[in-house]
Amino acid sequence: MNLQHTPLHDLCRDAGGRMVPFAGWDMPVQFSGLLQEHQAVRQQVGMFDISHMGVLRLEGTNPKDHLQALVPTDLNRIGPGEACYTVLLNETGGILDDLVIYDLGTNKQDSQSLLIVINAACSKTDTIWLKQHLQPAGIALSDAKNNGVLLALQGPQATKVLERLSGESLASLPRFGHRQVQFYGLGAKDPSSVFVARTGYTGEDGFELLLKAEAGRALWLKLLAEGVIPCGLGSRDTLRLEAAMHLYGQDMDINTTPFEAGLGWLVHLEMPAPFMGRTALEQQAEQGPIRRLVGLKLSGRAIARHGYPLLHNNNKVGEITSGTWSPSLEEAIALGYLPTALARIGNEVEVEIRGKHHRATVVKRPFYRRPSLS
């Protein structure tokens, strides 16, 4: 198998990264160990190479208006320097991918450029889908990553570390805010302009940075010198699951609607604009979905994994989509789908794990919420 390498691949190996195949890329699953990496992000700061993810630039006349036809979230709610999380839908309201849209415009009335970050596993299909629907309207799509680096710096100390390295104040940048930040000492050409967004996939404060390969490699080494712990896919998964953040392909897919996935807050049916799958979602909003994604806490230390059956009165009623041992809570947690009648908080079901039944209780999501948001 010919796996792709990010510009940080050799630096990840040098830092002790244990590499595994992921979505066609050779990526680090862990460095010092999952628990240490997880705790570093929860308590201090950690960094992730996420350069495997897709980054697209949309340019043209009012690209937001044309992209609106493909997503259920009112894009007029964001302006220049702002971003939103949403989902890409098909005609039946099924989720093709989840993504973050960044408005790169200079004013809200005349936004000519957007940035979209998409999942690595969906990068090719998303690009084809977007081109199919946007190019006829005169919207140009291009690879904004351009073999560069996408790096996530996450944790309560992320702001201090990034301010120290950039010399700029970032504390006032709001959640889902973004701007260009000038860094010195990241390459032959000073300063290096870095796209910095206050976004992440861990449930902690933090930033995601897009920059050229040379500058990205230099920044990685500077962060290591600052004592920032490199983190792999393993801790990224436990962190996002504690925060009840969805993993596309596991917790939702093309056969899942936003209402089923607990993402109904992304569907703005009050806006007049038509969008892909609107009719199906209007009907589901009126009737209610027949199943829902729920958070579960398990008794004991058994771990529920993707695909494990959920049982009620010894009958299979659903499946686990994601599960792990929570380092922060010291409990087994999981996400899974249950019939709506069984999806109420406090209800008990069972998970079948290697032939044995383990009690699981439906709980409120997220499982973990960082102290500043409590």
Swiss-Prot record:
GO biological process, any: glycine decarboxylation via glycine cleavage system
Q: Which GO terms describe its molecular function?
A: aminomethyltransferase activity; transaminase activity
- Assigned EC number: 2.1.2.10
* Cellular component terms (Gene Ontology): cytosol; glycine cleavage complex
> InterPro entries this protein is in?
GCS_T, GCS_T_bac, GCST_C, GCV_T_N, GcvT/YgfZ/DmdA, GcvT/YgfZ_C, TrmE/GcvT_dom1
- Supply the HAMAP family for this chain: GcvT
Q: What does this protein do?
A: The glycine cleavage system catalyzes the degradation of glycine.
- Please describe the quaternary structure of this protein: The glycine cleavage system is composed of four proteins: P, T, L and H.
Spell out the protein name for this chain: Aminomethyltransferase
- Organism source for this protein? Prochlorococcus marinus (strain MIT 9313)
Tell me what gene encodes this: gcvT
